Design a protein with these regions (language model features):
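Short acidic/glycine-rich loops and adjacent helix/strand connectors
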Residues: 1-239
């Protein structure tokens, strides 16, 4: 709320200093963003046209504008949370876009986000939901990530409210579907024990990146070219 009040004061000061009067109002299409609520109210009060823009299209359109391009282009938008056209949480998107419109060409396969926004500060929930989903796949590759893998025993031992999480995921209670790359990074960070209780949105992913930079050199060899379509998208399987 403090940030919102600061924005309102800055907006009023800007209009007064520069005698600026907007003719069109644009905002994120998210129904609950404070800035979007402000934009809708302002447009209504002043009789101005309102343009609501999808979050990830806005990212790509801004890059087009900065580079004086009109498109179409293939744009990749990877972030934490953005309200999708279908009402789901987007965040791992490949869009074919112009400045005016876009087509959602591909996205990270959706996974459960137990607790919705609460999972941002509790990424262990998301990690558990992913492992639970992998466990239900009859697939040799994804079987490596099943809940019965002994490597995940320490994670499961420290996980709280597992029975409640099972109910939420199985029944879809306050558990929206999500295609967010940021939430996926959060889950991996929690699963590895790097950051299970972040203090702010994105901290778990940032600490995961920091750990990766200080990790050992090397890689995981992939020799086959078998693509999996489904929960984990197009993943090249090791022969």
């Amino acid at each position: 709320l403090g940030a919102m009040h600061a924005w309102e004061e800055a907006h009023e000061r800007y209009e007064r200093l520069f005698d600026a009067h907007p003719q069109v109002i644009a905002c994120d299409m998210h129904p609950e963003y404070l800035a979007s609520k402000w934009a809708r109210e302002y447009a209504h009060e002043h009789g101005l046209p309102l343009i609501e823009v999808q979050h990830h299209h806005a990212h790509i359109a801004s890059v087009l504008g900065e580079n004086e391009l009109h498109g179409p282009v293939i744009g990749i938008a990877l972030d934490g949370t953005g309200y999708g056209m279908d009402g789901a949480i987007w965040g791992g998107e490949i869009l074919v876009a112009t400045r005016r419109d876009f087509e959602r060409f591909w996205h990270l396969p959706s996974f459960a986000l137990p607790g919705g926004a609460a999972a941002i500060l509790n990424p262990e929930r998301t990690a558990y939901a992913l492992l639970k989903a992998y466990s239900e796949l009859n697939d040799a590759f994804f079987g490596q990530f099943a809940l019965d893998n002994p490597q995940f025993a320490p994670f499961l031992e420290r996980l709280e409210n597992r029975a409640l999480l099972d109910q939420m995921i199985d029944k879809g209670l306050n558990t929206p579907m999500c295609s967010s790359a940021g939430r996926l990074f959060d889950a991996v960070s929690a699963l590895l024990g790097i950051c299970a209780h972040p203090g702010y949105d994105g901290e778990a992913a940032c600490l995961l990146e920091a750990s990766a930079w200080h990790g050992c050199e090397g890689g995981h060899p992939l020799t086959a070219r078998t693509f999996h379509e489904g929960l984990a998208g197009a993943i090249i399987e090791q022969a």
